[in-house]
Amino acid sequence: MRTSVTPLGLAALILPLALLPAIARAQTATSTKDFAVIGTVPAMCAGGTLSGDGTFDLGVLTDTTTGLLRTDLAAPDKVLVGSFCSTRSTLNLAATPMTAQGFTATAPGGFSRTVNYTATASGWTTTAASFDTAASANTAATQIRGTAFTGDIVVGIGNFATGGGQALRLVADPNYRGLVTVTLSVAD
C-alpha cells in the first residue's frame, strides 16, 4: 500500500519544523547562579634548607706559639636557601659563646674557657641582624620585615675575642662549643 502526501499534508508536516526556531527563541529566559570559590592561606614562615652542613668549624682556636686566641679565625658563611614568610615577619638571631665542654671548672689565673664572637644573619631585611655573645644587650638581634618575602638568609660569625680579655690564654679542651640560632616567625 502506497501512501501519498497531499500538499496540505506536506504543509502540516513542514510548518511545525519551520516554527521550531521561533519556539526556541520564545523560551530564552535564563536563570544564572553564582558560586563562590574560596580558600585560605595561613600566616606562616619556613627557615628554608641549609646549604652544606650546620657547623662553623674553626679548627684550632689558639696560636700554638703564644697560646693566645688566633687573630685570623674564620669560617665560611652558612646559607638558609628558600626561606619564606607569607606575611609580615620577624627574624631573631641568638648565639652562645664558645665554651670549653670538658674543662668546666673556673679557669685558673691568666686563662679563660670562653671565646666570644658576633653572629650575623643577612638577606632578610635591609639591616643584618647581629648578636654579640659578649654584649649584655643585643638590640640588633631582632629585625622585622613588613611584607611577605622569600629569599636566602646568610648566617656568619666573626670578631672573635677571648672571654675576660685578649691577654688571657685558653685552657686546653678538645671541644669548645657555641650555638647560633636563627628564628623566623610571623610578626605580631
How should each PLM-predicted stretch be described?
Residues 1-12:
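Bacterial N-terminal signal peptides that target proteins for export
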